[in-house]
Curated annotation (Swiss-Prot):
It comes from Bacillus thuringiensis subsp. israelensis. Promotes colloidosmotic lysis by binding to the midgut epithelial cells of mosquitos. Active on Aedes aegypti. Keywords: Sporulation, Toxin, Virulence. It holds the Pfam family Endotoxin_N. It comes from the Bacteria. Toxic segment of the protein is located in the N-terminus. This is Pesticidal crystal protein Cry10Aa. Belongs to the delta endotoxin family.
Amino acid sequence: MNPYQNKNEYEIFNAPSNGFSKSNNYSRYPLANKPNQPLKNTNYKDWLNVCQDNQQYGNNAGNFASSETIVGVSAGIIVVGTMLGAFAAPVLAAGIISFGTLLPIFWQGSDPANVWQDLLNIGGRPIQEIDKNIINVLTSIVTPIKNQLDKYQEFFDKWEPARTHANAKAVHDLFTTLEPIIDKDLDMLKNNASYRIPTLPAYAQIATWHLNLLKHAATYYNIWLQNQGINPSTFNSSNYYQGYLKRKIQEYTDYCIQTYNAGLTMIRTNTNATWNMYNTYRLEMTLTVLDLIAIFPNYDPEKYPIGVKSELIREVYTNVNSDTFRTITELENGLTRNPTLFTWINQGRFYTRNSRDILDPYDIFSFTGNQMAFTHTNDDRNIIWGAVHGNIISQDTSKVFPFYRNKPIDKVEIVRHREYSDIIYEMIFFSNSSEVFRYSSNSTIENNYKRTDSYMIPKQTWKNEEYGHTLSYIKTDNYIFSVVRERRRVAFSWTHTSVDFQNTIDLDNITQIHALKALKVSSDSKIVKGPGHTGGDLVILKDSMDFRVRFLKNVSRQYQVRIRYATNAPKTTVFLTGIDTISVELPSTTSRQNPNATDLTYADFGYVTFPRTVPNKTFEGEDTLLMTLYGTPNHSYNIYIDKIEFIPITQSVLDYTEKQNIEKTQKIVNDLFVN
């Protein structure tokens, strides 16, 4: 017996949770066909039938993408993970990634065009119909570039250990031929209005290749010339390409954000769009574009002459189990968190209600809401319970489950009614394919009325490295839209596995600590939504913010401390306390009047370094340190803090700083002679 067979109001609801899913192997009303057919979610099995050679990108796509985009999204995750690892290499030329590492990600399987077609499908979600000619245009661009970059890498690998005149000439000549071609191709994609939005994920990948190539020139161009007996000149030197690289970082970052926002607006203003459509575009673009441009600043050799330990602290959402009968704005408010400090799940309380109909013989226990407990970064002592989410009544029962940091949740399965995706009976939480715990409503409904859906952002493995996401929060919509009270929309949010709980300060790399990884901020300070290109949200600093970092035990090292920030405030002073008290004056970084955080461009951010180093301290026992950044209470201007960076005073940094000072002095002397 179907305990809901008389509730005809439900028939207007769609069961599939993904607005873009093309799978239709099961009837919308399965009870009318084969009531005993098992209904394990088969979306990914469908994708395997559609995507050729998809297995190299992972075997568990869950409910987060469609067959038309999964290969492209997977490639994007791998590229970002690869770059995070490469930037952390503690060598002088950190951030120079071999094209032999980057390019094979995009050319795999029997039809390498799959990746580029999927990237177009991601970018084209806001558009009703994509010009089919675009894929031909795109492949005609990327294939020759790939061939030339392969050749360039071959020449570079031959030159590096044997820096002869001939080897230097070969790599130098190919660079000067290839670089303007890539620049011209990117301009063509940007300047064609019909190409901009659909090609954005592909554009971001090609732009990454261009920045990587320019980083080669910024580092090695003078050496190539010297190997050939040529003296560097104003427009023919490593210094020139360093400046050119910095301009391109800004150009590509701003273009990607502007184009992404244009696509997001198109979906949001489309009256036929659902929240899942909106969220799918946001999720896929985050994984293929926004995560990428968030680490573009690391290519700047002036700011990052050595390795950089970077993190992505943004939070992304898998699609909700039902998004009908509410607007995008309503569901955005009901399912996503307001900007907050970075949190780590500690416990979860799950609520259950018996919605038994007196005419039915079943106890229809189902999920009705949740409450999450969490800690902040490097703080296991203070457990904070958040708000209760869902429409809870006094008759509801609840049970608390622990979450373990050494067993991060990377997949959630929802067991729900086979027809109605928002009637939930169980949630099963997994870590590395093993069940950690299971919430159950203990409903007596028969199993043939149940269906299981998976929610995850699949892990990707590349060159023996694994890149993934872990569950960061659960939120149930408070809105009740039916006389039957057990229907619930629930959303899962995820964060990148690059995030370090302890804020460990690296010995040999520059360590970036996002402002959102603070323990707390003063009551007059505020967390605000970021502009999209910083890898997370921002802190408006007024009085103070506290954060805890971890230094390695029994090791002594001095550090310079630097802040990445944005403000139109006149000169203000900030203080940093911890080992010692140091201060620095913050110049304004933008002349714009009271800019909103979401509107901040790349150029609106600046850096300031404290003039005194954090002195040597050897930690023999307790290796964590509480530090506080003080601003100006009740300041009328906003100071947006993005990151606090710790720069180790190593010989590599000292050598690079001395080299930069010599080059700046030489430029001043040259300018004097010219004038």
